[in-house]
C-alpha cells in the first residue's frame, strides 16, 4: 500500500454520494495531481476490473453555460461522481430573451425560474453563494460566507461583469442609461421605457469600447423600431445606434461584404441612424458624450448626442473573484485558457463562454469584444465537458478550434441570421440572411432551450407547477363563468381522440362540476398535457421533436418574403 493510502470501507463523502456498503476490501488513493476530493476506489474482489474514479466537479455559474455544463457532466461522468453548481443567484434566466423583456414582449417569469429544483432532480448539488476567490494550488473555491469547497475539476462559467464604472454616468444604478445584460436590468429598462412613451424623444442604442457580443444592440434597435411603429409613434422618436465598430456589421469578427451591406441597408430601411468608430466618454442627463476616431486611431471629432431613453452595452470585465485569483486571469479579469479551454497553469480548471479570454479576431481603432452567442457558448461547454471526461479516463483532450460564430437576431416582424466559419480569418463562410423565418426560428429556439433546462427525469412525478394543474386551478377560479370557449388559432384542426368509457364519463362529470363545456375542457387539458409531456422527454427525443415541429411549421407556412 502506497504512502498516504487509507483502508477500511467507504468514507462519509462516498456514502453521501450514493454508495452502499458492500463486503469488499476498498483502498483509497489520494492523488495530489488533481485534488483532495478525488479518489480511486479499487475493489480487491474484482481482479482485472478497471479502476473506478470518484471525482468532484464544481461548476461556477448557473446560466446558459453553467447549467447545460452541469447537466452534460452528470450525463457523461459516472454515477459515483459528484457535480456541484455554485451561483450567486438562485435562478436561471435565458439571456437571449432579455431584449424582449425590455420591450415588454416577455415577462420575467417567462424566461426566469428557480434552478435549484431542476438541478436536484438530476442529482446535482447547488450552492447559492457568491464566489470570493479561487485557490488553484489547494483545489478550492472560497465563498462569500467564509466556506470553501474542494474540487477535482473546476469549470468556470460566470459570464462577464458589466463595468459600468469605467464610463462616468453609464448604467442603470446611479447612471443615465439602461442595460439588458441581465434580466433585472431588462425589467428596469422596460419600466423606464413605459415612462418614456408618455413623453417620447430620441433613443440611443449604444455599445461601449471593450464591450462584447454586440449583436443584441442592433436587435434592440430594430425591436424598438417595430414596437414604436405598432404604437403609431415612430415618427416622434429618432433612433441612433452608436458603436465602436469601424463599420456596422463588423460585430467583432470583421464581417464585410454581404454582412455589412445587408445591415446598412436594413438600418436605412427602418430609418435608424448609426455612428461608427465612436468611443463613449461620459454620460450626463439626456446627453451622450462621444469621440469619433479615424482608421489610424486618431480622434477626429468630439461631440454630444441627445437622448430621452438609452440602452447601452457597457465595457466587459471578468468577475471580481477571477481577477482576485493570482495566475488565473488576464489584465481585464478574463480567464486565460489554451486550445482545450484549460488554464495553462492549472490543467484541472476550465473556462467557457464570456468569462474566458478571447484572442483578438480583427483589430480595430477602438477595442471591440468577441461575438459570443448561445451556439458558440454551447460549443465551449461541449469541449470542456468532453475534456474533463477524457482527463478522468486518462485520454488526450480535444481542441475547441476552429470555432464558428452563429446567431439569430429578432427584428420585430422579421429577423437576421449570421454565420461565419471559422471565426478567425481566413474564412470559408461569412454570410448574413434576413427573413421572417428568423423571427420564428428564434421563438422556437427560446422554447427549445427552456424546455431543455426544465427537462425532468422520466421517473419524476408531476408537481403543482404543471400546465395541467394550472389549467384546472384556473377553471376552478372561473367556475360559474366558463362559457364554452374555442382555442384560438387559424391553423387549428379537429382531432378525434378516443377515450376509455370511464374517462369519458369522468371528463363529462368534471366539466359539469366546473360549469364548462366538455369539449372546451378536453381541449384545455389536452393542450396542457402536451406542454407537460415535453418536461419528461430525453434530450435526444426533445431535440428530434423540435426538429420535426419546425418542419411541420415550415410545411404549413405561406411563402414569405424572399431573403435579401
Locate predicted features.
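Beta1-alpha1 glycine-rich phosphate/pyrophosphate-binding loop at the start
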Residues: 55-125, 209-253
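A Rossmann-like FAD-binding core segment of flavoenzymes
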Residues: 82, 121, 125-137, 141, ...
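FAD-site-proximal beta/loop scaffold in flavoenzymes
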Residues: 163, 172-197, 306-377
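Internal hydrophobic alpha-helix adjacent to the cofactor/substrate pocket in enzyme cavities
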Residues: 375-401
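Short, positively charged interaction helices/loops
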Residues: 404, 464, 532-564
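C-terminal auxiliary extensions adjacent to catalytic cores
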Residues: 417-463
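A detector of short terminal or domain-flanking linear segments
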Residues: 462-493, 501-502, 554-564
Amino acid at each position: 500500500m502506497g504512502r498516504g493510502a487509507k483502508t477500511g470501507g467507504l468514507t462519509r463523502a462516498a456514502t453521501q454520494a450514493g454508495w452502499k456498503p458492500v463486503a469488499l476490501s476498498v483502498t483509497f488513493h489520494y492523488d495530489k495531481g488533481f485534488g483532495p476530493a478525488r479518489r480511486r476506489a479499487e475493489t480487491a474482489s474484482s481482479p482485472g476490473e478497471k479502476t473506478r474514479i470518484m471525482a468532484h466537479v464544481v461548476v461556477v455559474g448557473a446560466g446558459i453555460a453553467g447549467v447545460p455544463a452541469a447537466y452534460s457532466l452528470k450525463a457523461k461522468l459516472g454515477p459515483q461522481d459528484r457535480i456541484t453548481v455554485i451561483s450567486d443567484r438562485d435562478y436561471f434566466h435565458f439571456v437571449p430573451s432579455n431584449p424582449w423583456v425590455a420591450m415588454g414582449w416577455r415577462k420575467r417569469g417567462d424566461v426566469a425560474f428557480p434552478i435549484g429544483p431542476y438541478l436536484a432532480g438530476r442529482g446535482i448539488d447547488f450552492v447559492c453563494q457568491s464566489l470570493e476567490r479561487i485557490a488553484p494550488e489547494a483545489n478550492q473555491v472560497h465563498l462569500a460566507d467564509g466556506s470553501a469547497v474542494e474540487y477535482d475539476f473546476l469549470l468556470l462559467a460566470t459570464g462577464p461583469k458589466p463595468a459600468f464604472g469605467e464610463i462616468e454616468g453609464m448604467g442603470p444604478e446611479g447612471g443615465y442609461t439602461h442595460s439588458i445584460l441581465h434580466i433585472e436590468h431588462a425589467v428596469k429598462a422596460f419600466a423606464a421605457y413605459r415612462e418614456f412613451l408618455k413623453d417620447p424623444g430620441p433613443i440611443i442604442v449604444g455599445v461601449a469600447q471593450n464591450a462584447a457580443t454586440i449583436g443584441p444592440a442592433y436587435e434592440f434597435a430594430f425591436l424598438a423600431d417595430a414596437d414604436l411603429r405598432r404604437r403609431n409613434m415612430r415618427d416622434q422618436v429618432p433612433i441612433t445606434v452608436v458603436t465602436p465598430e469601424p463599420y456596422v456589421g463588423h460585430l467583432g469578427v470583421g464581417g464585410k461584404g454581404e454582412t455589412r451591406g445587408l445591415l446598412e441597408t436594413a438600418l436605412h430601411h427602418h430609418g435608424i441612424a448609426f455612428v461608427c468608430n465612436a468611443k463613449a466618454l461620459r454620460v450626463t442627463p439626456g446627453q451622450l458624450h462621444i469621440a469619433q476616431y479615424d482608421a489610424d486611431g486618431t480622434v477626429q471629432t468630439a461631440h454630444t448626442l441627445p437622448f430621452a431613453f438609452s440602452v447601452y452595452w457597457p465595457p466587459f470585465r471578468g468577475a471580481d473573484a477571477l481577477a482576485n485569483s493570482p495566475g488565473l486571469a488576464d489584465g481585464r479579469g478574463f480567464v486565460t485558457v489554451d486550445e482545450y479551454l484549460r488554464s495553462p497553469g492549472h490543467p484541472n480548471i476550465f473556462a467557457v463562454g464570456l468569462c474566458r479570454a478571447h484572442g483578438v479576431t480583427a483589430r480595430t481603432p477602438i477595442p471591440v469584444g468577441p461575438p459570443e452567442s448561445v451556439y458558440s457558448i454551447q460549443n465551449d461547454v461541449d469541449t470542456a465537458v468532453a475534456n474533463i471526461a477524457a482527463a478522468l479516463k486518462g485520454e488526450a483532450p480535444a481542441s475547441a478550434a476552429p470555432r464558428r460564430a452563429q446567431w439569430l437576431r429578432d427584428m420585430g416582424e422579421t429577423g437576421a441570421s449570421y454565420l461565419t466559419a471559422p471565426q478567425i480569418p481566413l474564412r470559408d463562410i461569412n454570410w448574413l440572411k434576413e427573413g421572417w423565418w428568423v423571427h420564428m426560428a428564434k421563438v422556437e429556439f427560446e422554447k427549445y432551450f427552456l424546455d431543455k433546462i426544465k427537462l425532468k427525469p422520466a421517473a419524476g412525478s408531476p408537481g403543482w407547477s404543471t400546465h395541467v394543474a394550472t389549467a384546472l386551478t384556473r377553471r376552478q377560479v372561473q367556475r360559474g363563468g366558463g362559457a364554452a370557449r374555442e382555442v384560438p388559432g387559424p391553423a387549428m384542426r379537429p382531432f378525434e381522440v378516443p377515450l376509455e368509457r370511464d374517462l369519458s364519463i369522468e371528463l363529462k362529470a368534471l366539466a359539469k362540476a366546473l360549469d364548462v363545456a366538455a369539449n372546451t375542457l378536453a381541449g384545455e387539458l389536452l393542450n396542457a398535457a402536451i406542454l407537460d409531456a415535453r418536461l419528461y422527454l430525453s434530450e435526444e427525443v426533445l431535440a428530434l421533436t423540435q426538429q420535426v415541429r419546425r418542419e411541420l411549421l415550415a410545411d404549413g407556412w405561406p411563402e414569405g418574403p424572399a431573403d435579401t
